[in-house]
Each structure stands twice: as structure tokens, then as C-alpha cells.
């Protein structure tokens, strides 16, 4: 623990430093590759797997899998439904430790639903009443999507304005929003790559991570503003070096914040997915789990380097860096004598 504290202190004082800003092309390349993967792979796999809330359809919940293992229970349910309704496109999942079987199909008529309910009850050797049926229309999911997009647009606009006013430069705002979109694309893309079902709860999780990512970015940017604002005419650091120092100074804090945030989210994900079988808990926590990891990466390796790059072309920054390098060269000449 003491060594980790010393590590953080060394980063803060500059005794130890990682050249994060100077290697920004590497981080950009990694992000570009990830974004390419999460866009291309879902396309090759036929797109995202949207939940029944978005597409509409019928759902059947079997109270018990009759002592079968997960694979056997899924195969039995799939074959049973296809035997009754060959074109129903059944999607079978096992819910929780109680091994409840959930079957989702395309929209069915009342008679078709009753026939499948009876067939499932017979296949699993339970009463008809132990197989619950429900119909879900696509309207609710469409409303959630529309509201989510509206909320996303409003969030991006308001966050851009607030950050531009707070930091007094639109370039910090642009860097932060770019990092947010980076997080959203990769987090949502992971669902497409691994063919994880996208539900309204997952969409809510996608939007929630934007708040965390923005908070982490603001902490780093505040330190960047402090460092670059303190640098006067006699500064011994270039602008990029001041930004890099700020990132190193907040590195331990970013990691600690992420660990503290991800532990309870991971616990909820474990409990929701494996113990309770609660779909909503699982969907939200999975999106948050992925988003926190990606958000921490983007704050350190995307937002700060991008801001330094955006400012590097300014005349004032160029003059300052030129003056700093000239002072260093003069010092080396004097030292050589």
C-alpha cells in the first residue's frame, strides 16, 4: 500500500512520468482499431440482436427446466416451439439458478400462443399454469429508443456548452465530447460483437456511462487547466509536457475511481446474471461495467492527448514551446562549457 502511495506521489511530483501525450498516435490507433472491429463485426454477423421490447413478439416463461442442464433445456424448448410453429423464430435463454426457461418468439396469435404453452408444459412435464405467456408490442421499445436519442442529443449539446463556458475554450469541450462518443460506440459495439441482446435497460446503461466518463474527464481537464494556467513566460515545460504532467498527476485518482466504481457494478452483474436471473439488473450493470473500463481509457488516452493536439497549432502555444526549447538548448550549452 505504501509503495502504491509512493508511486502516486512520484507521478504527481514528476519524479516518475509516462509519456502519454507523446505517444498519442498509438492510443488513437488502438481506438480506431476497436471502433473498426465493433462496427464491422456486427455488420458481418447480421446486425445487433435487439430484445423483444424493440421488435415485439410473444414470450413464454417455463417455471422449471425439469432437472435438465442449460444446453438440454434450451434445445428442448427450441425443438418444442419449432414443432408447433416452424416459423416462429424462437430465442431461448436460461434465467437464474432456478433454471427457468424463457422463450421469445415472433408475434403469435392467441391460438398459437396457447398451443405453444401446452406443448412446453408437456415437454417439461409441468402444468400448463406453470408456463406463463405474455405479448409485448414494439411500441414501448420504440418510445424508449426515441427518448434515449433525444436525451443523448440534449446531453451532448448541454455538456458541450457547459464545458466550453467552464474551461473557457471550445477545444476542451470538443475533446471531451469526442471521448464520450468513443465510449458510447465501443460499449454499444461490444454488444454487437458478442451478439448480446440489446434491451431498453442496456440503452439506459449506455446513457448512464456518459455521466461517469464526463466526470472523469473533467477531473483531468481541471488539472490540465491548472498546470497550463500556472506556466508563465519562464516555464520549463512545453504545453504538451504540462498536459502530460496533469494526466500523470491524476492517473492514480482515475484508476482508483474506476476500481471503486466497477466493484459494486461487477457485484450487481454477478448477482443479477448468475444468482437472481434478473434481466434488467444484468443488462444495466453489463453496460456500466464495459462503459467504466472504456471511459477510464478514453479520459487518459484520448481526451487529454486530443486536447493537447488541438492546442498545439495555436500561435501562443508555438511561441511558448519555441521559447522553452531555446532556454533548454542554452542551458545545455552553458553546462557543456
Which residue stretches match the model-derived regions?
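A structural signal for conserved, well-ordered secondary-structure elements
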Residues: 1-337
Amino acid at each position: 500500500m505504501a509503495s502504491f502511495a509512493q508511486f502516486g506521489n512520484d507521478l504527481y511530483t514528476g519524479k516518475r512520468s509516462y509519456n502519454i501525450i507523446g505517444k498519442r498516435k498509438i492510443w488513437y490507433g488502438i481506438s480506431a482499431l476497436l471502433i473498426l472491429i465493433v462496427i464491422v463485426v456486427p455488420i458481418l454477423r447480421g446486425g445487433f440482436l435487439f430484445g423483444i421490447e424493440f421488435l415485439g413478439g410473444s414470450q413464454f416463461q417455463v417455471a422449471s427446466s425439469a432437472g435438465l442442464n442449460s444446453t438440454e433445456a434450451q434445445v428442448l424448448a427450441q425443438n418444442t416451439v419449432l414443432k408447433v410453429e416452424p416459423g416462429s423464430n424462437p430465442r431461448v435463454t436460461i434465467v437464474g439458478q432456478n433454471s427457468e426457461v424463457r422463450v421469445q418468439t415472433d408475434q403469435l396469435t392467441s391460438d398459437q400462443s396457447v398451443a405453444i404453452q401446452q406443448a412446453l408444459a408437456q415437454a417439461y412435464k409441468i402444468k400448463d399454469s406453470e408456463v406463463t405467456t405474455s405479448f409485448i408490442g414494439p411500441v414501448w421499445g420504440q418510445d424508449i429508443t426515441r427518448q434515449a436519442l433525444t436525451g443523448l442529443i440534449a446531453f451532448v449539446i448541454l455538456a458541450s456548452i457547459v464545458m466550453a463556458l467552464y474551461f473557457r475554450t471550445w477545444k476542451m469541450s470538443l475533446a471531451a465530447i469526442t471521448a464520450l462518443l468513443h465510449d458510447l460506440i465501443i460499449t454499444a459495439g461490444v454488444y454487437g460483437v458478442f451478439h448480446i441482446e440489446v434491451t431498453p435497460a442496456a440503452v439506459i446503461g449506455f446513457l448512464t456511462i456518459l455521466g461517469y466518463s464526463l466526470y472523469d474527464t473533467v477531473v483531468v481537464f481541471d488539472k490540465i487547466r491548472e498546470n497550463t494556467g500556472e506556466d508563465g513566460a519562464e516555464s520549463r515545460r512545453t504545453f504538451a509536457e504540462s498536459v502530460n504532467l496533469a494526466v500523470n498527476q491524476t492517473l492514480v485518482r482515475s484508476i482508483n475511481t474506476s476500481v471503486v466504481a466497477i466493484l459494486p457494478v461487477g457485484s450487481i452483474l454477478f448477482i443479477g446474471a448468475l444468482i437472481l436471473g434478473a434481466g434488467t439488473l444484468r443488462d444495466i450493470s453489463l453496460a456500466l461495467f464495459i462503459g467504466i473500463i472504456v471511459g477510464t481509457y478514453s479520459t487518459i488516452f484520448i481526451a487529454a492527448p486530443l486536447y493537447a493536439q488541438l492546442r498545439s497549432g495555436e500561435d501562443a502555444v508555438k511561441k511558448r514551446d519555441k521559447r522553452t526549447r531555446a532556454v533548454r538548448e542554452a542551458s545545455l550549452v552553458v553546462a557543456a562549457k
